[in-house]
């Protein structure tokens, strides 16, 4: 069983709805679950708890990520603790991949988080941090967190996604990136791999 969990502020583009419908029509044992709210880390925690209650793996899909059935199948096929698809930021001129080779949190001596971008992609590679826009997390990972904490609570100046990755790595889980496909990050313009300038 896989829960497709979508945190949303209230609306989802039809292209994303179409992506999810395509999976529901062509694959079995899939449950969509949508949570509306302005605090994304609370929405993600509600989705995580829903997946745990249903003894399911969890595929986070952000409400601005368009994906194909092939992309869905590739994540499932990887059969690993945590695996993300590759997508890129959607700000003009700053559209780096939303995955980082290293992620160092803010500390007393380090005033802000430090991230090291990926400069060379391998088809399948271990990373320290990914955005959760298209990320499959196995149920045993979800179950490893106490009910009393929100694993998405921002840590220092890291966002909820990288804070979650940090906690997962502290629990001994690897975070993998499947770069054999890319996703569309929707806005007024669909940013994807062809827009990436390689850190220039």
Region locations from a protein language model:
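Active-site nucleotide-sugar/metal-binding loop of Leloir-type enzymes
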Residues: 45-57
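Conserved catalytic core of nucleotide-sugar-dependent glycosyltransferases
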Residues: 48, 68-153
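C-terminal catalytic/acceptor-binding lobe
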Residues: 144-200
């Amino acid at each position: 069983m896989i829960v497709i969990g979508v945190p949303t502020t209230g609306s989802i583009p039809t292209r994303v709805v179409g992506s999810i419908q395509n999976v529901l029509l062509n694959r079995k044992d899939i449950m969509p679950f949508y949570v509306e709210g302005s605090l994304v880390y609370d929405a993600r925690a509600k989705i995580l708890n829903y997946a745990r209650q249903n003894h399911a793996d969890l595929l986070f899909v952000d409400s601005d990520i368009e994906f194909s059935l092939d992309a869905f199948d590739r994540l499932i096929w990887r059969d690993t603790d945590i695996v993300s698809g590759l997508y890129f930021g959607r700000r003009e001129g700053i559209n780096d991949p939303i995955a980082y080779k290293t992620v160092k949190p803010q500390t007393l001596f380090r005033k802000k988080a430090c991230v090291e971008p990926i400069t060379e992609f391998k088809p399948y590679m271990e990373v320290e941090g990914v955005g959760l826009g298209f990320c499959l997390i196995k149920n045993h990972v979800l179950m490893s967190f106490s009910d009393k904490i929100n694993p998405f609570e921002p840590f220092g100046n890291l966002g909820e996604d990288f804070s979650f990755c940090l906690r997962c790595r502290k629990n001994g889980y690897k975070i993998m990136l499947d770069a054999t496909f890319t996703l569309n990050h929707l806005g007024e313009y669909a940013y994807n791999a062809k827009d990436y300038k390689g850190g220039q």
